[in-house]
Curated annotation (Swiss-Prot):
Part of the 50S ribosomal subunit. SUPFAM superfamilies: Ribosomal protein L6. This is Large ribosomal subunit protein uL6. Belongs to the universal ribosomal protein uL6 family.
Length: 177
């Protein structure tokens, strides 16, 4: 049984949460997010908190309630504080620059890669080898970061590639003769 669903999500000042049938909308200073709630979960908004209750008789209702609680908590944090993900480019000649709403990546291929950023994600390049992605939707930020990392994942011998800022790359020893 999930214990995550038992903890309510507190609504901070400046954040408005509304429920219209099965659609939950969270509005805050940084933007607004909308999510359709699973039928196995009842959502109750009262006294500045959002509570999640499983529907009786539905298999895995507690699991769905816990998942819904985590997603709604991410929505509340996103519209109030926002999320950011940092990427680091490691390798000779690997660089990134911002061109309008796109990121121009040079990752050792014979051609430059241009990654178009979706709506709701902003990027910043403090240096040629660093990328900072910001936005209100945690899932979207993680998806964009994973797509950029997927162009050239870190390899285990020299550690070259695109990695998350907090990622530790396991290194292998080269073959000995």
């Amino acid at each position: 049984m999930s214990r995550v669903a038992k903890a309510p999500v507190s609504i901070p000042a400046g954040v408005e949460v509304t429920l219209n049938e099965q659609t939950l909308t969270v509005k805050g200073a940084k933007g607004s997010l909308t999510r359709v709630i699973n039928n196995a979960v009842n959502v109750v908004i009262e006294d500045g908190v959002v509570k999640f209750l499983p529907v009786e008789g539905v298999v895995n209702a507690w699991a769905q309630a816990g998942t819904t609680r985590a997603l709604v908590n991410n929505m509340v944090v996103g519209v109030s504080q926002g999320f950011e993900r940092k990427l680091k480019l490691v390798g000779v000649g690997y660089r990134a620059k911002l061109v309008g709403a796109d990121i121009d990546l040079t990752l050792g291929f014979s051609h430059p890669l241009v990654h178009k950023l979706p709506a709701g994600v902003t990027a910043e390049c403090p240096s040629q080898t660093d990328i900072v992605l910001r936005g209100v939707d945690k899932q979207l930020i993680g998806q964009v970061a994973a797509e950029i990392r997927g162009y050239r994942p870190p390899e285990p011998y020299k550690g070259k590639g695109v990695r998350y800022d907090d990622e530790e790359v396991r290194r292998k020893e080269a073959k000995k003769k």
